[in-house]
């Protein structure tokens, strides 16, 4: 418990001095303390900050660009200043990346699977999230959450995790905003067309949850965040479920989808 308190104190510092290269939830509200049992926070003492999702007792899914030296992983956290009795701390044992020589890699290979150094115990505030059984539906209302900035471009960070609802949008809308996006990729385009809500700095690697399934991983967005008609790019988890399950089942040499 003392280790968790020390790590929580480091997290408070991260939320005060978070790097400006990650992503956050703008326009959200404080999450219900029981609605983000799968949400994890990744950070280190150098100022890196990301989210992630617990998908079983030993594995966390996040964005590849969230890789950092001396990574610490906290689970069961709601508030940086108020400790939950069931918070748990873990270190990464192994990290798996979806490497590719494809020129479009930056658009659809931003995924990292982390095996924890020891299994997590399910508790009141900790439980894994289900992987998707099908891709997200266009127009679906989905949930984002994290400890990312709540203002942009002058970032301020919350004490407690923030949640917001956004919509699955047409891929062509993101393609029109982000120059160089290919005609097709393993990206989910999501946000609010009028702006005002969205993932932002500090939320990278965190979940896009639709119908209680992990459909996306926060990858990239606009700057400033949550601008009208500037959606956020989420890695489409459904396309990687075979890769993820193969690694969990012990196949460490499995290749990513092309």
Curated annotation (Swiss-Prot):
Originating organism: Trimeresurus albolabris (White-lipped pit viper)
InterPro entries according to UniProt: Peptidase_S1_PA (IPR009003), Peptidase_S1_PA_chymotrypsin (IPR043504), Peptidase_S1A (IPR001314), Trypsin_dom (IPR001254), TRYPSIN_HIS (IPR018114), TRYPSIN_SER (IPR033116)
Signal peptide: 1-18
Pfam families associated with the record: Trypsin
Stated name of the protein: Thrombin-like enzyme chitribrisin
PROSITE patterns: TRYPSIN_DOM, TRYPSIN_HIS, TRYPSIN_SER
Tissues in which the UniProt entry reports expression: Expressed by the venom gland.
Main localization (coarse): secreted
Protein task: Thrombin-like snake venom serine protease that activates fibrinogen by releasing both fibrinopeptides A and B. Also has fibrinogenolytic activity, with a complete digestion of alpha chain (FGA) at 30 minutes and of beta chain (FGB) at 60 minutes.
EC numbers on record: 3.4.21.-
Assembly notes: Monomer.
Compartments where found: Secreted
Organism superkingdom: Eukaryota
Keyword Cell inner membrane attributed: no
Activity regulation comment: Inhibited by EDTA, but not PMSF and beta-mercaptoethanole.
UniProt keywords, alphabetically: Blood coagulation cascade activating toxin, Disulfide bond, Fibrinogenolytic toxin, Glycoprotein, Hemostasis impairing toxin, Hydrolase, Protease, Secreted, Serine protease, Signal, Toxin, Zymogen
Uppermost EC category: hydrolase
Domain Peptidase S1: 25-249
Residue stretches in coiled coil: none
GO cellular component, one term: secretory granule
SUPFAM superfamilies, A to Z: Trypsin-like serine proteases (SSF50494)
Protease keyword on record: yes
Any one of the GO BP annotations: proteolysis
GO molecular function, one term: serine-type endopeptidase activity
């Amino acid at each position: 418990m003392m280790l968790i308190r020390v790590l929580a104190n480091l997290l408070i510092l991260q939320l005060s001095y978070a790097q400006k290269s990650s992503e956050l939830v703008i326009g959200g509200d404080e999450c219900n303390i029981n609605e983000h049992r799968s949400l994890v926070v990744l950070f280190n003492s150098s100022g890196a900050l990301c989210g992630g999702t617990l998908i079983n007792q030993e594995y966390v899914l996040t964005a590849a660009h969230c890789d950092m030296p001396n990574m610490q992983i906290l689970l069961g956290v709601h508030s940086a200043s108020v400790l939950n009795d069931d918070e748990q701390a873990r270190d990464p044992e192994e990290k798996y990346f979806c490497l590719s020589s494809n020129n479009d890699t930056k658009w659809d290979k931003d995924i990292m699977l982390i095996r924890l150094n020891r299994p997590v115990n399910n508790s009141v505030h900790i439980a894994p999230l289900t992987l998707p059984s099908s891709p997200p539906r266009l127009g679906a209302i989905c949930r984002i959450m994290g400890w990312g900035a709540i203002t942009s471009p002058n970032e301020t960070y919350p004490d407690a995790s923030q949640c917001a609802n956004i919509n699955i949008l047409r891929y062509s809308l993101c393609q029109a905003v982000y120059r160089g996006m290919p005609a097709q990729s393993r990206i989910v385009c999501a946000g609010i067309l009028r702006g005002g809500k969205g993932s932002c700095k500090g939320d990278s690697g965190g979940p896009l949850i639709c119908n209680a399934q992990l459909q996306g991983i926060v990858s990239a967005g606009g700057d400033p965040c949550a601008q009208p008609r500037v959606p956020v790019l989420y890695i489409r988890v459904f396309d990687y479920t075979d890769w993820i399950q193969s690694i969990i089942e012990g196949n460490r040499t499995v290749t990513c989808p092309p």
